[in-house]
């Protein structure tokens, strides 16, 4: 029998080490698949660069780098790209990238090499151009959404990062999906589920933020007998496919999170099957395809 995607979290301590390096967030042993892999289709990594140069390489169709710390530049796909904390970079096939920083930097790096390894194929065609999503623009858009009296009440207060090459899926690449999300202080973002695996990265938070994950809902539309993942800035955790999950902020400050999924592929295959719970409170709870 094929094993399920496990619950697993990854400590942010790697981002404090004194030397450059790459840490694959590998659960391939639990998945019983050729490694390394964080989900059947994706591999997430922590990357640390200390005053110098580091090369990354992946036999993948899509790579996403989120700049968690620092500033510098990257040479990839025949281009030199300047980056700073909070920026997002995506690169297509031809997986080598050379990163430079004069100080200290950290990336959250996700790519789809495990999917290609399973299929026994290599990426031969660039499906999109190297793209940078600047933090300042994403943050301004997120603030606009959070300030609007209508959109601020949405199930998720977030900016969906999308590439114009993929107008049907509206995703950051043809396989990857990424969202720059806000979890406002004192708020609960109610349960929803989807058939893509989420590799969540906590950008910033204070103690008191967490995600509840589980397979069932109670009569009030909240997660029944859930597994709790406490947030910590720079940490990552896995949300298994098909599991309900809700986000909670019991701290006194806003928090930010970056879920990355294989939902670009699922959306194209029409297998995402996203559902939202609408808890009861003063009325009967229900589930729908609308947030």
Feature roles, as predicted:
Residues 82-103, 110-113, 228-251, 258-262:
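Conserved metal-binding segment of the jelly-roll/cupin
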Residues 102-162, 173, 206-237, 248-291:
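Double-stranded beta-helix
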Residues 1-39, 120-175, 179-180, 283-291:
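A short, N-terminal "cap"/entry segment at the start of jelly-roll beta-barrel domains
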Residues 35-38, 52-63, 79-80, 95-103, ...:
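Short, low-complexity cationic-aromatic patches
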Residues 22-33, 42-59, 177-197, 243:
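Conserved short histidine dyad/triad with adjacent acidic residue
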Residues 45-47, 73, 110-111, 178-182, ...:
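A structural feature that tracks compact, well-ordered secondary-structure segments
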Residues 49-87, 202-233:
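A short beta-strand-loop-beta hairpin characteristic of the jelly-roll/cupin
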């Amino acid at each position: 029998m094929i094993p399920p995607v496990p619950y697993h979290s990854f400590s942010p301590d790697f981002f404090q080490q004194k030397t450059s390096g790459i840490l694959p967030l590998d659960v391939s042993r639990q998945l019983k698949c050729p490694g390394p892999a964080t989900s059947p289709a994706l591999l997430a990594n922590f990357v640390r660069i200390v005053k110098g140069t580091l090369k990354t390489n992946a036999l993948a169709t899509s790579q996403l780098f989120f700049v968690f710390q620092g500033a510098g530049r990257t040479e990839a796909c025949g281009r030199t790209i300047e980056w700073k904390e909070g920026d997002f970079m995506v690169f297509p096939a031809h997986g080598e990238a050379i990163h430079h920083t004069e100080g200290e930097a950290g990336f959250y790096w996700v790519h789809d090499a495990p999917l290609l390894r399973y299929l026994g194929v290599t990426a031969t065609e660039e499906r999109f151009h190297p793209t940078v999503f600047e933090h300042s623009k994403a943050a301004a858009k997120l603030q606009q959404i959070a300030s609007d009296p209508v959109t601020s009440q949405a199930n998720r207060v977030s900016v969906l990062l999308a590439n114009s090459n993929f107008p049907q899926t509206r995703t950051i690449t043809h396989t990857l999906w990424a969202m720059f999300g806000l979890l406002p202080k004192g708020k609960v973002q109610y349960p929803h589920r989807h058939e893509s695996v989420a590799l969540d990265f906590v950008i910033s938070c204070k103690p008191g933020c967490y995600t509840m994950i589980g397979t069932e809902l109670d009569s009030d539309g909240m997660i029944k007998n859930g597994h709790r993942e406490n947030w910590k800035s720079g940490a990552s955790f896995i949300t298994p496919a098909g599991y309900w999950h809700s986000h909670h902020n019991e701290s006194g400050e806003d928090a930010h999170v970056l879920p990355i999924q294989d939902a670009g592929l699922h959306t194209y295959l029409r297998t995402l099957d996203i559902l939202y719970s609408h808890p009861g409170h003063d009325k009967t709870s229900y589930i729908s395809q609308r947030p």
